[in-house]
Amino acid sequence: MGGYNKRGYLNSDFKIFHLTDQISTEFKFHYHEFHKITIFISGNVQYFVEGKTYPLEPYDIVLVNRNDIHRVQVDPSLPYERIIVYISPGFIDAYRTDDYDLSYCFEKAKKEHSNVLRIHSLEKSSLFKITNRLERSFSDTEYAGSLYRLSLIHI
């Protein structure tokens, strides 16, 4: 991808992180070979995706398609809290059927040049609750934890 660096690697079907930090580093434009979803929780952040700028509001969902050029600009005086999900293209392809296609949200975001979903009541939604359960499942050492994670994805 001419002049842009590839950042991050994904060695599994998906990965989820819940991060809160104060970032003083300026991020350069970059891309990933996997899809990325960021659920913005708090801070003062602008997200840049494929030439568009999005000032984020709490609980915005940022959809970054694989190979999209993007970066984040963070106000270093405030904590930046977010949940990040990396999803491999192979994982999405494995769950594509005639009835549904998990890549639809990424394709629609790209087609409509609108990478942010603004859901004002997200923190009360079942999607947010499942995301939190999925996040916690990665730290669980319970029997069949990976099966539990897959069942959460199927919900």
Q: For each predicted feature, which ranges?
A:
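Short, solvent-exposed positions on alpha-helices
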Residues: 125, 143-151
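A general structural signal marking secondary-structure boundaries and capping sites
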Residues: 66, 138-141
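Conserved small/polar residues in nucleotide/adenosyl-binding loops
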Residues: 153-155
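A hydrophobic/aromatic-rich effector-binding and dimerization subdomain
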Residues: 1-18, 73-138
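A conserved hydrophobic position in a structured secondary element of the catalytic/binding core
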Residues: 64-65, 87
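Residue-level recognition of short, well-ordered coil/turn positions
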Residues: 53, 142-143
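Generic protein-terminus/edge-of-domain signal
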Residues: 1-61, 68, 100-104, 111-115
